[in-house]
């Protein structure tokens, strides 16, 4: 039998990634956008042109296709009078930034995911807690035996539970 850790972890990572896409941008991300925007706002009037937007996106590592730029340009001309201010720029870039970082799981996201599994909040995930969480997340896709094997594999110290450190190691496999 193939070890079920892979599908369970992939599903959990996908769930965390979806939450990442729904979160607001953090102060560091907004500051990164502000610095990039100011670099292209040559006349310091608080606006950049459609053309500058494409170049700005490229300097930030996004490679919009010509079609995407045309669509953005039309949207900007129709809704924003042909120019983009910082707030509009943030609104345009937020989905791209969130999609880019969605696959990256940070410590806080790991803690949040761990708390989802640790139903009683004692700092350890028991077989029962994992079964409940997997049932919620995956439905009937994993059997009790498979879930038990997940705990056994993740339980490095052999105490029958998965602590946060073991959880992080399990998720990074």
From Swiss-Prot:
It comes from the Eukaryota. PROSITE patterns: EF_HAND_1, EF_HAND_2. Ca(2+) 1 binds at residues 41, 43, 45, 52. It is found in: Cytoplasm. GO terms for molecular function: calcium channel regulator activity; calcium ion binding. Transmembrane segments: none annotated. The keyword Metal-binding applies. The keyword Phosphoprotein does not apply. Expressed in the retina (at protein level). Keywords: Calcium, Cytoplasm, Metal-binding, Repeat. InterPro entries: CaBP1/2/4/5, EF-hand-dom_pair, EF_Hand_1_Ca_BS, EF_hand_dom. Ca(2+) 2 binds at residues 118, 120, 122, 124, 129. Ca(2+) 3 binds at residues 155, 157, 159, 161, 166. GO terms for cellular component: cytoplasm; cytosol. Residues 28-63, 82-99, 105-140, 142-173 form the EF-hand domain. PANTHER family: CALCIUM-BINDING PROTEIN 1-RELATED (PTHR45917), CALCIUM-BINDING PROTEIN 5 (PTHR45917:SF3). Inhibits calcium-dependent inactivation of L-type calcium channel and shifts voltage dependence of activation to more depolarized membrane potentials. Involved in the transmission of light signals. May positively regulate neurotransmitter vesicle endocytosis and exocytosis in a salt-dependent manner. May play a role in the extension and network organization of neurites. Interacts with CACNA1C (via C-terminal CDB motif) in a calcium-dependent manner. Interacts with STXBP1. Interacts with MYO6. This is Calcium-binding protein 5.
